A protein has these predicted regions:
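Rossmann-like AdoMet
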Residues: 1-144, 293, 299-302, 307, ...
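Conserved acidic residues
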Residues: 145-146, 229
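Active-site flanking residues adjacent to catalytic metal/cofactor-binding acidic residues
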Residues: 83, 112, 148-151, 234
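Long, Lys/Arg- and hydrophobic-enriched amphipathic alpha-helices
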Residues: 194-352
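A mobile, often basic/glycine-rich helix-loop segment
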Residues: 147-200, 248-256
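Short, glycine/acidic-enriched loop or turn micro-motifs at the edges of active sites
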Residues: 87, 116, 154, 238, ...
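Short helix/loop capping segments that flank catalytic or ligand/cofactor-binding pockets
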Residues: 120, 157-159, 241-242
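A short, conserved alpha-helix within the catalytic core of class I
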Residues: 134-138, 154-169, 211-221
């Protein structure tokens, strides 16, 4: 009996009919027995895509400065809590803790990660702890003072798709395997309204937009969790009208082994499925900036200069400290690149 994810999805569609696109993405990414992340996919040099924390420890060192700045604004409270969602194997947590932010001297750093295999690789001890879902912390009640942060999470939350057909928006759903190839297909579903005003009548049939209900709900939940502090997300972003004006293949992307993957319907669970984050579908009130500007505001240039001086002092030794110092220069280039990671958007909601 075929128990693969594809076979199970085909069986479900055969019984219940075409599947909403967001349910399809959820299964392809997070099914515990065949989803992309449960099967070992993820960020890192040996995996499928590279995020800012995997570039090196410099990103975490700058975020540690941001955390301290928020702690200072709140009056240096005891018990300051840092919550990192989609923490993976703890790469960012390691870098932040290694930087030694003052806010964690009497505080805690909680990694939230739904993948059990990733949690098994996370660092432990000291101020660090781990939970499988943000709801665990929500159940404990509001965090008096702290921050919630997520790097490239929202683009990986399940999202729906709408498509213009004869001047109206329709849901996009997934139908079961058909024909000799046995491929899943995206087909039109029921007519519906878009999440924000985007005129379908003025756009050609086939125009698509994402519906990012889960991303909006996540931000709202994170804001509600923090009594005083901030919610910070880093991601590649756009707006719903902007995406309506572009081919969907430009903003709905798949990745496998550091390269672009195939169609989102191709071999369920074999590739990452991502979407640009529509900021106009998120809760209002965020302060937005580019990653490059954010990192400069919190001292990346000073850290790089300090690393350059340390390298000059210790280059003749060639020890690990000297090599790490030299690495800051190349890390900064990647993190600040306006055509790459530096062009990502940083959104911060201040909670009080």
């Amino acid at each position: 009996m075929d128990t693969s994810l594809g076979a199970r999805l085909a069986e479900s569609i055969g019984v219940h009919g075409p599947m909403p696109f967001d349910d399809w993405v959820e299964a392809c990414l997070y099914d515990p027995d065949g989803g992309f992340y449960a099967s070992g996919g993820g960020a890192g040099r040996r995996n499928d895509f590279l995020t800012s924390p995997e570039v090196g420890p410099l990103f975490g060192a700058v975020l540690a400065r941001w955390m301290d700045s928020r702690w200072e604004v709140l009056g240096r409270p005891e018990g300051f809590t840092v919550i990192e969602v989609a923490a993976g194997i703890g790469t960012l947590a390691r870098s932040v803790v290694a930087a030694g932010p003052a806010c964690l001297a009497g505080g805690r750093y909680v990694m939230v990660e739904r993948s059990a295999s990733s949690r098994d690789e996370q660092p432990t001890g000291g101020c660090l702890s781990s939970v499988p879902d943000l709801s665990v912390l929500v159940g404990e009640g509001p965090v008096d003072h702290g921050v919630v942060l997520a790097n490239e999470l929202l683009d990986n939350l399940a999202f729906g798709l709408l498509e213009v057909i004869d001047g109206r928006w329709h849901q996009v759903v997934i139908d079961g395997p058909h024909g000799v190839s046995g491929e899943f297909r995206m087909v039109p579903g029921e007519a519906t309204e878009p999440p924000v005003p985007v005129d379908a009548g003025s756009r050609p049939s086939g125009t698509r937009i994402p519906v990012q209900t889960a991303a909006a709900a996540w931000v709202a939940e994170a804001i509600g969790l923090v009594g005083a502090g901030s919610v910070l997300v880093v991601d590649y972003t756009s707006t719903t009208p902007e995406m309506a004006d572009r081919p969907s293949g430009q903003w709905l992307r798949t990745y496998r082994g550091h390269e672009r993957g195939g169609e989102p319907t191709e071999v369920p669970g074999s590739q990452d499925v991502t979407v640009e984050v529509a900021v106009d579908q998120l809760p209002p009130g965020a302060v937005a900036d580019t990653q490059a500007a954010f990192l400069r505001r919190y001292g990346i240039d000073n850290l790089v200069e300090a690393g350059r001086r340390l390298w000059e002092e210790r280059a003749h030794l060639g020890d690990l400290e000297a090599i790490r110092a030299r690495s800051r220069v190349t890390e900064a280039k990647a993190l600040l690149d306006p055509t790459g990671l530096g062009g990502f958007t940083v959104l911060e909601w201040v909670c009080s």
